[in-house]
């Protein structure tokens, strides 16, 4: 069943199948449309929002998308206990800008007292894992959030983080937010991360599933797209006609096909979607029915040749 999915650790055994959010979600629409989109997401049971302060490292762009979201969610009338907030902690200027400072800033900008979960972001070079794990635990102890995950971490560092948490009796990461979808599968389904998902040590939060819109036919996206790991973006754009053809065969939209593929993986807790219009949200929600109607095995069979990152390192190294 499409509804039989894992959660994000013991604190969140059930989460919505879809999570709204991306770099530019809330600053790509009129404010009233943002309010209506949030309200409709809650009505559909998808009141899970991935929201971050993007003003550090390669994301130093002075974005206001998080502030817009904070105002919009209040205007939509959602009580804080009725929606889930997934935040970000960045390692780009860590520990110069520590997690306490980052959380203070993020929570103030959104206008809430705490998040529910956070993702500790990706990085270049080496990081002080002992300090990262301890500092995350400090934020959990302070009530800033209840669980944490990692974003595209190198597998060796992730394993070290597990060991540190176990030895020190601290909270380990419970999910991984990974690039995952029709075209990019190597990391989530490869020999390194897949055993962690299979054992239940981690669950998967799928991100970048449409490659910035390329896999739903937007071949000239006007928004930022995540890193092109492996340099395969041109190949991904070239796969669009095949995606469209398979979706048509299933009497579904390309977006529904892409989301259903992610949810067909039993490790997937939920899928991040960067909708900026209510019509997109309504369409995306149809992915659940598609998966129930067609089945995971059939979807994977039909999309087998769309796996385009087979030669990309599965261990998180670039």
Feature locations, PLM:
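Beta/alpha (TIM)-barrel catalytic core signal, keyed to glycine-rich beta->alpha loops juxtaposed to Asp/Glu
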Residues: 123-306, 310-313, 317-318
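Short, acidic/polar
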Residues: 29-41, 95-111, 129, 158-163
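Conserved, mostly hydrophobic/aromatic
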Residues: 20, 34, 41, 49, ...
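Active-site groove signature of glycoside hydrolases
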Residues: 108-126
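Active-site mouth loops of central-metabolism enzymes
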Residues: 21-32, 87-97, 121-122, 126-127
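Charged helix-capping and loop-helix junction motifs
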Residues: 33-36, 63-68, 100-102, 130-136, ...
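N-terminal binding-site loop/beta-alpha segment at the start of enzyme catalytic domains
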Residues: 1-81, 141
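Acidic (Asp/Glu)-rich catalytic clusters
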Residues: 9-14, 42-43, 70-82, 104-113, ...
């Amino acid at each position: 069943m499409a509804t039989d999915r894992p959660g994000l650790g013991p604190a969140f055994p059930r989460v919505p199948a879809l999570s709204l959010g991306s770099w530019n979600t809330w600053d790509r629409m009129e404010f009233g449309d943002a309010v209506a989109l949030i309200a409709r997401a809650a009505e559909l049971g998808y009141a899970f929002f991935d929201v971050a302060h993007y003003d550090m490292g390669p994301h130093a762009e002075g974005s206001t998308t998080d502030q817009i979201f904070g105002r919009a969610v209040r205007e939509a009338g959602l009580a804080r206990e009725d929606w889930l907030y997934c935040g970000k902690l960045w390692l780009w200027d860590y520990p110069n800008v520590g997690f306490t400072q980052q959380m203070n800033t993020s929570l103030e900008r959104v206008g809430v007292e705490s998040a529910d979960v956070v993702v500790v972001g990706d990085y270049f070079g080496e990081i002080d894992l002992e300090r990262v794990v301890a500092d995350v635990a400090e934020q959990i102890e302070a009530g800033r959030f209840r669980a944490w995950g990692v974003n595209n971490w190198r597998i060796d560092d992730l394993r070290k983080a597990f060991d540190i948490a176990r030895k020190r009796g601290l909270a380990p990461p419970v999910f991984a937010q990974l690039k995952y979808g029709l075209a990019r599968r190597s990391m989530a389904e490869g020999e390194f991360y897949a055993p962690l998902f299979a054992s239940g040590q981690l669950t998967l939060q799928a991100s970048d599933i449409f490659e910035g819109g390329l896999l739903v036919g937007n071949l000239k996206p006007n928004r930022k797209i995540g890193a092109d790991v492996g340099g395969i973006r041109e190949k991904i754009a070239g796969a669009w006609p095949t995606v469209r053809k398979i979706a048509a065969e299933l009497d579904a939209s390309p977006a529904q096909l892409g989301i259903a593929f992610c949810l067909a993986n039993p490790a997937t807790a939920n899928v991040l979607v960067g909708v900026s219009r209510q019509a997109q949200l309504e369409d995306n929600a149809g992915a659940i029915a598609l998966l129930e109607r067609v089945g995971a095995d059939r979807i994977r069979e039909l999309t087998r040749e769309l796996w385009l990152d087979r030669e990309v390192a599965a261990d998180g190294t670039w």
